[in-house]
Amino acid sequence: YGRRRHPKKLTPLAYKQFIPNVAEKTLGASGRYEGKITRNSERFKELTPNYNPDIIFKDEENTVMNQWPGVKLRVTEGWDEDGHHFEESLHYEGRAVDITTSDRDKSKYGTLSRLAVEAGF
C-alpha cells in the first residue's frame, strides 16, 4: 500500500501478434458474438458517437502523447456497417477498433499495440 509501481518496460507487439494470443473473434478474446448492429436496431442507440473534429481519440492517460510528443492516436475504423469485414466482425457491434498514429509512422505500431493492451483494449 502507498507504493508506486515502477513503470514496466513496454515491449512492442510483433506484426500479427494478439493479446491475448487468440484471434479477435474467439471467446477468450472478446466474448460471444451478439449480432450485427444496424442503424435501425435498438442496440445502435447504445453506441457513443464522436462528432468533434478536434478529437481524434479519448486518451485520458495521454499514453500516446507521453510516448511520442505531438503525435495523436488516430481511429481509422470503429463501428461499421458497410459489409467489408468478415460476417461476425466485432466492428459491426462497435466492439472493435482499428488505430494508427496521426503521423502514420508504421515503426510505432508495435508499441502502439502494446499501449492499447496496457490500456485494456
UniProtKB/Swiss-Prot annotation:
InterPro entries: Hedgehog, Hedgehog_sig/DD-Pept_Zn-bd_sf, Hedgehog_Signaling, Hedgehog_signalling_dom. Ca(2+) 1 binds at residues 60-61, 76-77. Ca(2+) 2 binds at residues 61, 77, 80, 82. The C-terminal domain displays an autoproteolysis activity and a cholesterol transferase activity. Both activities result in the cleavage of the full-length protein and covalent attachment of a cholesterol moiety to the C-terminal of the newly generated N-terminal fragment (N-product). The N-product is the active species in both local and long-range signaling, whereas the C-product has no signaling activity. Cholesterylation is required for N-product targeting to lipid rafts and multimerization. One of its GO terms (molecular function) is peptidase activity. GO terms for biological process: animal organ development; cell development; cell fate specification; cell-cell signaling; central nervous system development; neuron differentiation; proteolysis; regulation of gene expression. Zn(2+) binds at residues 91, 98. Intercellular signal essential for a variety of patterning events during development. Signal produced by the notochord that induces somite patterning, dorso-ventral patterning of the brain and early patterning of the developing eyes. Displays floor plate-inducing activity. Binds to the patched (PTC) receptor, which functions in association with smoothened (SMO), to activate the transcription of target genes. In the absence of SHH, PTC represses the constitutive signaling activity of SMO. This is Sonic hedgehog protein. It comes from Puntigrus tetrazona.
